From Swiss-Prot:
Thylakoid-determinant subunit of high molecular weight LFNRs-containing protein complexes. This is Light-regulated protein, chloroplastic. Component of high molecular weight thylakoid LFNRs-containing protein complexes containing LIR1, LFNR1, LFNR2, TIC62 and TROL proteins. Interacts directly with LFNR1 and LFNR2; LIR1 increases the affinity of LFNR1 and LFNR2 for TIC62 and subsequent thylakoid relocalization. It is found in: Plastid, Chloroplast thylakoid membrane; Plastid, Chloroplast envelope; Plastid, Chloroplast stroma. Signal peptide: none annotated.
Amino acid sequence: MQTAASSVVGLSAVLPAAVKGRSLQIQAPRRVALRVRAAAAAVAVEAAEVDYSSNISVFPMEACDLIGGEACNVQMYPEAKLSSSAAVAVSRAAAEEVDRDYLSYDEPTTVFPEEACDDLGGEFCKAT
């Protein structure tokens, strides 16, 4: 197989030599055509995009269980669940009222004084 491959490229491993007074003749390399089955030459190409629209979970631990191989080469942690006391604290924080000052935007030329001073300078800085 190696000599066939080298002749396809056009390289010859052995050059003819002069034998018993004959002159040295260099022959042109022979080209041998090899037929390769298309199925054997095909290379598997992975898609550059991943479709996440399936009903199957893509969590690493489950992927490792289902697929194995490279899917198991990630750092995995056990599933974390919030305790009931943490869930109550989160809901309390969300319900907490915050006192805010709102500006009225009903005028056609509402301007923030600090931003006007920073952007425009001059007479706009006197208003602050």
